[in-house]
């Protein structure tokens, strides 16, 4: 694997773990203000992000690449209202998308088709992530100012359940340098 592609994939692992950390912080905030549905939404989101990190980890391992773990930064944000985490989440998802796009571009430059194929799943996933974050902002803008609307939105978010991702492209690996 190209050294730059491997480096970018390693960096993405850290970004995904940071995402999980950030979303757990959002979940903690919402739990502290009694919005259990919002807490559930972001707790599930944190699980997804952790799994995304593990998918990148497994892809690197399957391809004989080393994995380097960096420190996870403390999330910094103002806990001033219920909308702040929602807007911060959308901005963050856009940053994650940009990171995945950068890996794809680097893989394209060196004709690393296997990595490009693996990233196709993440590109689609990021489209979903950004849409979900934007939709949540829209719903909060529509209903969040009304206590009944906020209650209904909170109840809707409480119903979200975690589903682990599955990526069959991780089953296909190149020979490990250890096998050479």
Question: Where are the model-predicted features located?
Answer:
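Conserved alpha-helical segments that form or flank metal/cofactor-binding pockets of metalloenzymes
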Residues: 30-71, 133-136
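Acidic/His metal-coordination segments adjacent to aromatic residues that form catalytic metal sites
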Residues: 1-6, 71-91
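Single conserved hydrophobic/aromatic residue that forms the stacking wall/gate
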Residues: 172-180
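Short terminal interaction segments
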Residues: 143-171
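A structural feature that tracks compact, well-ordered secondary-structure segments
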Residues: 8-12, 20-24, 97-101
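Short, flexible active-site-proximal loops enriched in glycine and acidic residues
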Residues: 62-72, 99-101, 110-112
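Acidic interhelical loop/turn segments
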Residues: 2, 31, 98-124, 138-151
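Generic structural signal for well-ordered, non-transmembrane alpha-helical segments
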Residues: 14-17, 43, 47-54, 87, ...
């Amino acid at each position: 694997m190209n050294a730059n592609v491997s480096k970018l994939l390693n960096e993405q692992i850290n970004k995904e773990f940071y995402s999980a950390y950030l979303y757990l912080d959002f979940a903690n905030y919402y739990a502290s203000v009694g919005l259990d549905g919002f807490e559930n939404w972001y707790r599930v989101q944190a699980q997804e992000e952790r799994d995304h990190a593990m998918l990148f980890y497994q892809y690197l391992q399957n391809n004989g690449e080393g994995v380097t773990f960096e420190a996870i930064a403390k999330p910094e944000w103002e806990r001033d209202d219920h909308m702040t985490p929602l807007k911060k989440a959308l901005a963050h998802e856009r940053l994650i998308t940009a990171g995945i796009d950068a890996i794809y571009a680097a893989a394209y430059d060196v004709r690393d088709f296997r990595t490009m194929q693996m990233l196709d799943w993440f590109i689609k996933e990021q489209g979903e992530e950004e849409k979900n974050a934007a939709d949540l902002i829209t719903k909060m803008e529509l209903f969040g100012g009304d206590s009944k609307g906020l209650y209904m939105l909170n109840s809707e978010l409480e119903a979200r359940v975690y589903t682990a991702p599955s990526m069959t492209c991780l089953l296909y690996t190149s020979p490990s340098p250890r096998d050479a």
